[in-house]
């Protein structure tokens, strides 16, 4: 029997409770910062972002709102990154008029947006009260009364169609983290941690209204949005023949919503992908893939040559397959499941921001 004592804290204070030994677990809306990582006590080991100490439990949508006096109801991801990361940071209005951009909202939510977009400049201070600020943007997980919702596009010259890999129609999905104190877990804490990575726990997450890790499958015939994105937004290096081969190879397969993403130019998976590995392991043990063929399909961003990106996407697909084989203690997986590297093909987002590049740098699982 375990008794959970809960306290309502923001992310900063929750992580502080972990570091000071006042809590065993912290539910946060952002990852730990470098300053928080550096504040580990001597009796703690590892790091706050290590897969043993940090998992993405769910996702939630972040929304942007503007003042009613601002006629602009649309913004691309690249415009948003520029507004938050550049000086002076301008919010484009009609007739060529621009106003200084200001980001407001609760600290947790503004920091979650900045981490999501990989913009690490501190938000600009708001002008004194009473000063008109048509360039104000408010970030929130809830509806903001009397303000106007701003639609966010994945960018490039044309709006990108939704892709559905843990990032459906709304692109601003922020992870909800569960962080454990980086020290030896009590048995009950370890059991609870393991349970949260089971399909049953993810079903509960979805029931609560959050975006869960539960796998969803989509056939290639339902991927018209990805194909349109590839045709409209991929560099000329990505030949029509490559797209044809992608469709031929994936015909008859269904794409799972689980994906694995990598740090730029490496085969190192990010923290969210590490949690996906553990979740995938439990799906195997539950017999989810019994009697099915599986293919690990790698993709890249547009950094580097097209040929080099095909190779690195193939290497990443092989790395994920090998890691799964190790987790399952089944070396036959290295030969039993196919791998495919499609390089820059089928992009989920425009490559003109770090966020978009991270979305495209992935390995997907396709089954039939």
Q: What are the language-model segments listed below?
A:
Residues 77-94, 195-220:
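Periplasmic-binding protein-like
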Residues 61-70, 168-169, 173-188, 262:
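A bilobed periplasmic-binding-protein/Venus flytrap-type ligand-binding module shared by bacterial periplasmic
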Residues 202, 206, 214-293:
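Periplasmic peptidoglycan-binding/tethering modules of Gram-negative envelope proteins
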Residues 37-53, 60, 145-167:
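Ligand-binding "clamshell"
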Residues 1-84:
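N-terminal segment of the mature folded domain
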Residues 54-128, 146:
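Extracytoplasmic ligand-binding site segments that recognize negatively charged/polar headgroups
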Residues 13, 299-368:
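Periplasmic OmpA-like peptidoglycan-binding domain that tethers envelope proteins to the cell wall
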Residues 14-17, 102-164:
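Ligand-binding pocket segment of bilobal, Venus flytrap-like solute-binding proteins
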